[in-house]
Amino acid sequence: MGPFGARASPEAGQVVKQPLTDDPQESLAQGESERLPPRFATYFHIHLVSDSTGETLNAMARAVCARFTDILPIEHIYALVRSTRQLDRALEEIAGAPGVVMHTIVDPGLRAALEEGCRKLEMPCIAALDPVISAMSRYLGARISTRVGAQHALTNDYFDRIEALDYAIAHDDGQGGQDLTQADVILVGVSRTSKTPTCIYLAHRGVRAANVPLVPGRPPPPELFELKNTLIVGLITSPDRLIQIRRNRLLSLKENRESDYVDADAVRQEIIAARRLFERQNWPVIDITRRSVEETAAAVINLLSGGRGKVEVLG
């Protein structure tokens, strides 16, 4: 591993096709364990050079690479590259593992040096944000800022996200019911319907999100039904998917005994009861069966931005 924390990879400079293990945790580059890879995949090196945290560049690279089937990237991340010395070290590592270079370098001198270095190495050098920034500049008729890491400035939005995160943690799993009126949205659903991760993701977007579990034999907190101006969203999923998730949860806890928690009939009754509650209260419903946490959060944000009528967002 180099000084910038490059990912583990095949031998430097190679684009290889190799059999993958049966364990998806081991076989996916970057630890993407949510989808099974093809039995054979092509690996390639992608170098991400940033003068800031690298988060924007990393997200863009992953989004682009996801569009190619059977091709898995080996990421090499070079963050906080703000001097010629740091750039030279990055170029040394890039030379040892030929591939694609993407960057979000702002400083003109460093950009030129990186592009020249890649030209000598005969590697593509992509300024990831340039097309979008140029188009925005032309449309707005505004000059482009050269301030490094401008998106990470300590603005009011930053502190709003911190407060939203604190709120989500304090109001997870039905806690803090006394001040649910402070929530922008409350997610309601049976156990293992991604309520907590969705709330955390929403918090990173500055949304104050609480969640309330629906537990068989236990009525929801009465405060939930007294709210007038807070968006409440019901989360549901298919019985088969819910049983699978719950069984995996029990296995992780080394709990093997059968119970209503994973009983097919009991799970179906839980979901039916949840649906009936949502219908009675006229709460919008999101089916998370085929949705990632990010997609569920996006659907919630759409509901926050638009109407709050009786809507069901299908998976």
UniProtKB/Swiss-Prot annotation:
Q: PANTHER family this protein is in?
A: PYRUVATE, PHOSPHATE DIKINASE REGULATORY PROTEIN 1, CHLOROPLASTIC
Tell me, what does this protein do in biology? Answer: Bifunctional serine/threonine kinase and phosphorylase involved in the regulation of the pyruvate, phosphate dikinase (PPDK) by catalyzing its phosphorylation/dephosphorylation.
Which species is listed as the source?
Caulobacter vibrioides (strain ATCC 19089 / CIP 103742 / CB 15)
What name appears for this protein in its UniProt entry?
Putative pyruvate, phosphate dikinase regulatory protein
A family per Pfam = Kinase-PPPase
User: E.C. number, please?
Assistant: 2.7.11.32, 2.7.4.27
Q: Which InterPro entries match?
A: Kinase-pyrophosphorylase, PPDK_reg
Example of a GO MF term: ADP binding
Catalytic activity, per the record? N(tele)-phospho-L-histidyl/L-threonyl-[pyruvate, phosphate dikinase] + ADP = N(tele)-phospho-L-histidyl/O-phospho-L-threonyl-[pyruvate, phosphate dikinase] + AMP + H(+); N(tele)-phospho-L-histidyl/O-phospho-L-threonyl-[pyruvate, phosphate dikinase] + phosphate + H(+) = N(tele)-phospho-L-histidyl/L-threonyl-[pyruvate, phosphate dikinase] + diphosphate
The answer to keyword Transferase applying to this record is: yes
Region annotation (Disordered) maps to 1-32
Regarding protein family, the annotation reads: Belongs to the pyruvate, phosphate/water dikinase regulatory protein family. PDRP subfamily.
User: Which keywords fit this entry according to its UniProt record?
Assistant: Kinase, Nucleotide-binding, Serine/threonine-protein kinase, Transferase
Q: What sort of enzyme, by top EC class, is this?
A: transferase
Identify the residues that bind ADP. Answer: G189, V190, S191, R192, T193, S194, K195, T196
